Amino acid sequence: MVSQTQLRLLAVGTTTALGLAALSWQKHEKRGRGLLFSPSEGTTVDAARTLNRGAGLLATSVALDSALEHYRGDFQNRAMYTPLAASTLSLLASGQGQQDPDAFASKVRDPIYVLTGLTGLVGTGFHLYNVTKRPGGMSWSNLFYAAPLGAPAALVLSGLLGYYSEQLRNTSGDAEPRVMGLPAGKSVALMAAAGLLGTTAEAGLLHFRGSFQNPAMYLPVTAPPLAATLLATSALTSPRRRRLRWASRLVLRFTAFMGFAGAGFHALGIARNNGGWRNWRQNLQAGPPLPAPPSFTGLALAGLAAHSLLDEEKELAQYRWWK
């Protein structure tokens, strides 16, 4: 049995370790090594491939999480197989896109990402119906224990990140790269910031249900909103604010590491349930969702890709009106 004091020490130690890891990564980039696993192509294609990685992480999280949750629901509705297929396709497309150095959109990946996003939207509708059809409608009890509203939204985000990556490839030769009508860096930054806030809302709801019994449960409701705020502010203010951008990158890196650490904490939560991992078939379904936290990592990678685009845009005279 883990005591509350031990949990506090674990939370403090983990936060310190994540901060040091983020600082180390920050210094690593300063020495000119670029983004982690950075390709050797131009900035726009580099950012597109980083978005592919983010989309793949989100797709992996959704595939595993929906498999567990829908298995628990005995796949009563045959539509419950759809997110498994869509997330698997998104994962395969993202893996191929991460290896693709071409500066133009794929005719295969692009429609897969659109289909993935649409599947997530339809899934959100199904989950909303599942919540509202129960006695009490949109009550706290139903939000806690009915179909999670945020789960299919992660599939929407996977599709969005992938779609943005393909749009970036198409604009890589343009003098003024734009995505969805906005400068590419600004567009990707705002999308990633919105995704971080939405994912935080889902984590906050479930951690509130768990009464924040582990102090580390406060991390995913504090670091990602801070990362989203700094990222959006960096995109909407003057590129001369170097300290702001430095802080934004640092918190995004912290959030990226936090996503993987969160999976470890969820594994600990499963181990603390009755029977622990010996009773894995039950505890994987009843305990905290093991595949969920890396969604933060995927969105943090998207934020870092946005920063590389923002830095590139800073050097272009035609964007200086945007300070």
Residue spans for each PLM region:
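Short amphipathic, positively biased membrane-proximal segments
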Residues: 1-323
